A protein has these predicted regions:
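Ligand-binding beta-strand-loop-alpha-helix segment within the catalytic cores
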Residues: 153-155
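N-terminal non-catalytic cap/leader segment that marks the start of a structured domain
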Residues: 39-123, 217-220, 228
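Structural signature of FAD isoalloxazine-binding scaffolds in flavoprotein oxidoreductases
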Residues: 19-25, 119-136, 151
């Protein structure tokens, strides 16, 4: 979540360009204006992604069709048939077809410190709808007459196969990969830190994510990734996933 800015409300205004990054993953960029993205294809995450021999996988929209892409060794964006895309012309989608989104509130010690709030002893879990996620370089609408639209740099963990009643030690075997996200919160509407309501966290396109899904076997230690937030090119937050207060879950 929020990293590296002590006791400061991390807000954005209309037109701000917000960039969140995680070393070894890549960037997600967001503009605070409205956007709309169609979807015409539903890949199977357990089969489609397992068959791809690439470190990073993403999804883009080409001629109104969802197309899977990979990143080449020299950083180019390429389709499965070898077409190399110009990144400035790409319309990015979230790197995977969205299923259930589980979120942990106040899951970083720095985030709790920024908000002058004691980190909880147990995870605060809430769900987000599919409508909340939007791709790299897309746009997010800032509601009118609000003061506290907070950016929240996140490491997103992508589960690659069905799991139920597994132990914490087994959990890593179900992780397909990782990506980076900006989980906006409209704190003007917050009634209770323990129960963020729909207007705070479940707005359309309020969570830019991607562009790349980095395979789990490419990340030696996901609890030692550097996270950075930049507003209009200026670094405003910096920290690591070591500050994650809940590194395992049952």
């Amino acid at each position: 979540l929020l990293l590296g800015v002590e006791y400061q409300a991390p807000t954005v205004k209309a037109g701000d360009k917000v960039q969140v990054t995680a070393n070894l993953l890549d960037t997600a960029v967001d503009f605070t204006v409205e956007s709309s993205l169609p979807s015409t294809h539903t890949p199977n995450i357990e089969t489609d992604y397992a068959a791809i021999n690439a470190q990073r996988v993403g999804r883009v929209l080409i001629d109104n069709t969802v197309t899977q892409v990979t990143q080449t060794k020299n950083g180019q964006v390429q389709t499965s048939d070898g077409l190399v895309l110009t990144e400035s012309d790409i319309q990015w989608l979230p790197p995977i077809e969205i299923g259930t989104v589980f979120a942990l509130g106040l899951n970083y010690a720095d985030h709790a410190k920024e908000l002058a709030f004691n980190a909880p002893e147990k995870p605060l879990v809430f769900l987000k709808g599919k409508n909340t996620l939007v791709g790299h370089n897309a746009q997010t609408r800032r509601p009118k007459n609000i003061e506290y639209m907070h950016y929240e740099c996140e490491l997103a963990v992508v589960i690659g196969k069905t799991a139920s009643n597994i132990s914490a030690d087994e959990a890593k075997d179900y992780i397909l990969g990782y990506t980076v996200a900006n989980d906006y919160a409209i704190r003007d509407y917050l009634e209770n830190y323990y129960r963020p309501n729909f207007r705070v966290k479940n707005r359309d396109h309020c969570t830019p994510i991607g562009p790349w899904l980095t395979r789990a076997d490419q990340i030696a230690d996901p609890m030692n990734l550097k996270l950075t937030t930049r507003i209009n090119g200026k670094t405003t937050q910096e920290g690591t996933t070591n500050y994650n207060t809940k590194q395992k879950g049952g």
